[in-house]
Amino acid sequence: MKTVKEKKECQRLRKSAKTRRVTQRKPSSGPVCWLCLREPGDPEKLGEFLQKDNISVHYFCLILSSKLPQRGQSNRGFHGFLPEDIKKEAARASRKICFVCKKKGAAINCQKDQCLRNFHLPCGQERGCLSQFFGEYKSFCDKHRPTQNIQHGHVGEESCILCCEDLSQQSVENIQSPCCSQAIYHRKCIQKYAHTSAKHFFKCPQCNNRKEFPQEMLRMGIHIPDRDAAWELEPGAFSDLYQRYQHCDAPICLYEQGRDSFEDEGRWCLILCATCGSHGTHRDCSSLRSNSKKWECEECSPAAATDYIPENSGDIPCCSSTFHPEEHFCRDNTLEENPGLSWTDWPEPSLLEKPESSRGRRSYSWRSKGVRITNSCKKSK
């Protein structure tokens, strides 16, 4: 039987061993997040690092904190989260211990009933916790997180559709497509794809499904930004559209300095196609008048000469929706766990209404040089 001294020594050894297992954090050289005590990090995992009024927070830590209300307008504080509320939430989190790293400052708690686990967002991501970016923005620990019924025979036998590398042996690191059951992805690959394509271009890489696929990805904790795609936000992304076409496409160019040279005025002025703007010609190369400013290329001239519009042109589909700019985050407490209730419906094509057919016989008339022709073939001068 152990003595009291031996029991205390065993407890001390167990405590020291437990301390060594805790993730050691390097001393920070810059600002850290008030709600997870970490540095800026990867925006795809933690969101944008926001700094204002001597307060610095990760965007994801801000919207996922369990007791942080959004009481302000979108242009106040941090997307509607007021500084005084953030300070109160940081004070509350300072009393909560993370079940992963065993340190204080855990602002997120598991939303499962009777679960008392709290965790920092980065710690939870390392352990396999899951946070949902819709509705009430709930978070779950690794024991109570939503799961998928992925067939284990696929893991290790197939590769990720996006990166073409082998799938992870851990099911929490893989996500299965709801519309293409044979397609399985790495979680990090889907998150990177969602961060790049954003809401307006996010769809199934296999079948282009834009309804079930985004809803399932939201349920499985993928953050889909409500903004323009990353390639549209790059500086000078549309600079090519502002470049004027500068080439003569006439069959025989008569200009001595070549097809890529032209003058601002006169016979060697470059005239662009009035329909497409992607073809050009010198005035003399196409025998245009000195004051002519309108010209059409061979590809557009037949279409421009067509004046007849068929009666069933109303069957041509067109897009009836318009583009909406980025919207600010707003936490909705009325939505359930189904992401379809908070996911904006993707625009569907609509059909133009067919014009009502006129009753009776139609009357057509043409006027040319004083001659009037009607459907009864009567002529009068």
Swiss-Prot record:
Q: Where does Zn(2+) 6 bind?
A: C248, C253, H282, C285
This protein's major location comes to nucleus
Superkingdom of this protein's organism:
Eukaryota
Q: Which reaction does it catalyse?
A: S-ubiquitinyl-[E2 ubiquitin-conjugating enzyme]-L-cysteine + [acceptor protein]-L-lysine = [E2 ubiquitin-conjugating enzyme]-L-cysteine + N(6)-ubiquitinyl-[acceptor protein]-L-lysine
- Pathway terms, separated by semicolons: Protein modification; protein ubiquitination
> Found in which tissues?
Highly expressed in Sertoli cells, but not in germ cells in adult testis. Expression in embryonic testis is 30-times lower. Highly expressed in colon, spleen, white blood cells, pancreas, lung, liver, placenta and brain. Detected at lower levels in thymus, small intestine, ovary and kidney.
PHD-type Zn finger ranges:
96-145
Renumbered to this chain, region (Required for association with and ubiquitination of H3) spans: 244-301
Q: Does the keyword Zinc-finger apply?
A: yes
Q: Where is this region: Required for interaction with ubiquitinated UBE2D2?
A: 150-307
Could you say which residue ranges form the zinc fingers (C2HC pre-PHD-type)? 30-68
| SMART domains recorded | PHD
Q: Write out the residues that bind Zn(2+) 5.
A: C179, C180, C204, C207
Which intervals of the chain are annotated as region Disordered? 341-363
Q: Positions of the region Required for interaction and ubiquitination of the nucleosome core particle? A: 67-92
Compartments it resides in: Nucleus
List cellular component terms (GO): cytosol; Golgi apparatus; nuclear speck; nucleoplasm; nucleus; plasma membrane
Q: One MF term in GO for this entry? A: zinc ion binding
Annotated Pfam families:
zf-HC5HC2H
Its function, per the record, reads: E3 ubiquitin-protein ligase which ubiquitinates histone H3 at 'Lys-14'. Required for male fertility, via inhibition of SPOP-mediated BRDT degradation when in the presence of acetylated histone H4 in early condensing spermatids. Stabilization of BRDT allows it to facilitate histone removal in early condensing spermatids and promote the progression of histone-to-protamine exchange. Promotes the expression of steroidogenesis proteins in the testes, and as a result plays a role in maintaining testosterone levels and repressing osteoclastogenesis.
Instruction: Supply the domain comment.
Output: The extended PHD (ePHD) domain is required for interaction with the nucleosome core particle via binding to DNA.
Q: What is this protein called?
A: E3 ubiquitin-protein ligase PHF7
Q: What is the lineage of its organism?
A: Eukaryota, Metazoa, Chordata, Craniata, Vertebrata
Q: Which gene encodes it?
A: PHF7
